[in-house]
Structures are given as C-alpha cells and as structure tokens.
C-alpha cells in the first residue's frame, strides 16, 4: 500500500499475529505455552469506496497445527458511509489466556471527490532555511493522504509532505496534521495544524496555495518554526 500509510496513525497497519512458544517456570517445572498464528487473506491495508459494501477477505488461524479459525474474535470499526481510516482486529487467546492478534487497515475514500485520496510530492519540492537562504530538495517522492470532511474542508495527514515523518524517519508523531479548506476556484486556506512530537503548528500557509483540478496538482508553501519554508508540489496518485 501507499507509503503515506507510514504516517497515518502508525497505525493500524501493524500486524501483531505470530506463532511461537515460550517456556513458563513454576514450582520447579517448565511448561511450554503455544500461541496461535493468524494469517490474513488479501492485503493488510485496503482502500474501499465510500458507500460501497466492504467484504472482509477473511483469515486463517492455526495453533500447534490445528485449525482454530472459528475461535478468533473479530472486532471491526469499518463504516463505509464515512470517509476515514478504520481497523479490523483479529484476536485469539490460547489455553493459558495469552493473546495473539493481528489487524487490517481499511481506508474508506469518496472516489467521486477529486481531492480525496493519496498525493505524492515531487522530488524537487524543497525546504528553505530563511535565515541562511539554504535550500534542500526532498530528493524523493513521499505520499500523503487527504480525506474530505465536508464543506470544502479536508484533513491532511502531513502538510509537510513527509519531510520529517518519512524522509527523516522520525515517524508519525512528526507529521504535520492539518485541516485545509479548498474554495471553488481552488484557493487553499489553512484552518489548523499540529505536530504532536513537538507540540507546535505551522506559522502560515502561502497566499498562493492552490489546487489545480485540471492538472491534478496542489502547490503551496508552509512556513514552520519561524524560519523554515516548505515549498511543496503534490500530484494525485491513481488508485
């Protein structure tokens, strides 16, 4: 799945299922406890259209060579009536009460909304230190996710287009979560932002920030930390 999912809530893509055994010692005796292995059918991350019916591809669970699929508990938050990121958790406890689990991420997108979906920054996007004038290119394409919230408002999982989260490898806490508004003519305004890892936000979004529907591009400059300008060009990623 798309690289931006790294920055989506670290999320939900994490597979915890495993098969193993471990020794337990009690009163001078050593026992072995076995864990189940849960294997997903299909992808661990799936994209489905808003308003469609989601069908779980299923899974298989085994423990000590025995099929225990029917003993797995499935918990799902998937709601295809609303765009968003959802999870399905599959879990099973062994005879000793130890849990094995794995999960699937389901991203619900309005496929009729041209803005909603995955976007990739161009490698020539760049960060400028306004104190020194030094500019550094992104050097690679990093993907982000934009989800509609209604009324022309959109949630962006990383307004910095992966600079810290993906390029620097800092992880999800250093993605700049943001809410933007896109007007009918394509003008973009910033309604709010937040970087959890540093507890701060963007200083400003450039007045010329623009969504070009015909070219399927988004261009903007976001000022951060008082002296860093991130000049970003995004291209829509076809699913």
Can you describe what each PLM-predicted range is?
Residues 1-42, 238-239:
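Bacterial Sec-dependent N-terminal signal peptides
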Residues 22-30, 92, 101-104, 173, ...:
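Glycan-association/targeting regions that enable binding to alpha-glucans and other polysaccharides
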Residues 34-66, 160:
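Solvent-exposed, low-complexity, repeat-rich "mucin-like" stalks and linkers
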Residues 51-53, 64, 73, 77-79, ...:
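Disulfide-stabilized cysteine-rich extracellular repeat microdomains
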Residues 64-104:
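Serine/threonine-rich, repeat-prone extracellular segments and beta-strand-based repeat modules
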Residues 80-83, 105-120:
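N-terminal helix-cap/turn-to-beta initiation motif at the start of protein domains
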Residues 112-239:
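Ser/Thr/Gly/Pro-rich, low-complexity flexible regions
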């Amino acid at each position: 799945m798309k690289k931006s999912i790294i920055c989506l809530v670290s999320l939900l893509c994490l597979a915890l299922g495993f098969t193993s055994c471990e020794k337990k010692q009690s009163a001078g005796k050593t026992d072995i406890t076995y864990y189940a292995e849960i294997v997903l059918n299909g992808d661990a991350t799936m994209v489905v259209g808003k308003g469609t019916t989601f069908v779980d591809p299923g899974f298989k669970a085994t423990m000590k060579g025995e099929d225990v699929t029917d003993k797995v508990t499935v918990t799902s938050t998937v709601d295809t009536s609303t765009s968003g990121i959802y999870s399905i958790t599959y879990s099973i406890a062994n005879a000793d009460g130890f849990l094995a689990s794995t999960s699937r991420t389901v991203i619900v997108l309005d496929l009729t909304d041209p803005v909603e979906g995955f976007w990739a920054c161009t490698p020539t996007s760049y960060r400028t230190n306004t104190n020194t004038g030094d500019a550094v290119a992104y050097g690679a394409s990093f993907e982000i996710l934009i989800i509609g919230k209604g009324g022309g408002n959109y949630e962006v999982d990383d307004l910095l287009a992966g600079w810290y989260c993906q390029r620097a490898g800092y992880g999800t806490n250093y993605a700049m979560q943001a809410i933007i508004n896109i007007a009918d003519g394509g003008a973009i305004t910033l309604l709010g932002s937040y970087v959890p890892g540093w507890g701060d936000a963007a200083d400003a979004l450039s007045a010329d920030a623009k969504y070009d529907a015909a070219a399927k591009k988004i261009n903007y400059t976001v000022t951060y930390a008082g002296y860093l300008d991130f000049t970003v060009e995004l291209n829509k990623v076809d699913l």
